[in-house]
Amino acid sequence: MVRSSISRPVLAAALALPAAAGAEEITVFAAASLTTALAEIETAFEAATDHDVVVALAGSSVLARQIRQGAPADIFISASTDWMDAVEADGLLEPGTRVDLLGNSIVLVASGSDAAPVEIEPDLDLAGLLGDGRLAMALVDAVPAGIYGKAALDGLGLWDAVAPQVAQADNVRAALAFVTAGEAPYGIVYATDAAAADTATVVGTFPADSHPPIVYPAADLATRDVPAEAEFLDYLRGPEARAAFERQGFTLLAP
C-alpha cells in the first residue's frame, strides 16, 4: 500500500490493515522521487511473498526527522546520503545493511510539450527564460532535489539571478506538479520524475559536475525487529526491482 506525500507526522504511515496470517508487514519510508518505481516493486514483492508493504513517501528530510523522533519504520530509502548519515549517527541503522542503491540526475523541465531545448551552462539566461514566471524547486535547504538543484545553479553562477523567482515545494513531486499544472513555466526535478510526467518537457540536463553526486542509500532500520525487512532489502537489489528502477531511469549502483 503506497501512501502519497506526507503532510502530517509520518507516524500515521504505520497504520495499515492487518496482514494475513503468517505474513509480516513492512513499513518503508522512501523519498518521494521513488513513487512510481516503488509502486511497481511493492506489487511484485507482495505477489511473490506473503508479506504486506506499506510505503510512506515524502521528502528525505521529513522522513529522517520522523525516524529520529521514533516513527515505526523498517526500511529507509533516502535521496541523500546526508540524511541517511543523520539517521545512522543516531544509531538507528541495523549495522552492515546500508547500501548505495541508486543514482539519478537533475534536469530543467518546462510546462507543455513545445518548449525549446537549452544548453545548461554558465551563460544561460535562465532569468530571461522565466520572464515573470517562477522556477519550481523542492525545498532548497532541506529536500535533496532542491539542495542538488541549488548547488547546480550556484556552481554555474545562475543562482543569484533566479533566487527571487524560486517557488519552493515540500518535495520533488510537488515541485513537478507546479510545472505540469502550468503554475510555473520551468522547474528543476530529477530526471526520473520528469520521465513520469506527461505534461512537462525536459529541456536540459544539469552537468554532473555542477552538483554533488546524487546517491540513494537504503538501509534496514534498527528501530523494529521485523524479519521480513531484510528480505525486502534484498529484493530491492534483485533483478525484478533493478528492472523497475531502470525503467524509471535510475542508475543502478548496488551490485
Q: Across the structure, where does each feature detected by a protein language model lie?
A:
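Bacterial N-terminal signal peptides that target proteins for export
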Residues: M1-L11
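Leucine-biased recognition of intrinsically disordered, low-complexity hydrophobic segments
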Residues: L11, L15-L17
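N-terminal signal peptide c-region/cleavage motif recognized by signal peptidases
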Residues: P18-A23
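Exported/periplasmic ABC-transporter solute-binding proteins
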Residues: E24-D50, V54-S61, R65-A71, S78-T81, ...
